């Protein structure tokens, strides 16, 4: 038989830490958006224009992936927070039943 131990306070703390990390990553991603998606050509020739467009495309691709990862991160953090509340409620109910 396997046992699982969940400490609600630790889950809440982890959710808070994850939210803080996510905020930092999102701020960094927003700060880098203009510099990575709107590159100017190094010269006025066709090759420089294509290279700048290529790298801008990579930057836009990163921004799209970053948005998806931010959404996943938010959902995961919410699930962790909800789990902490559920475990705390279950623990309180268990203690209450033992007292009766």
Describe these PLM feature segments.
Residues 1-100:
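A glycine-centric feature that highlights glycine-enriched low-complexity/repetitive segments
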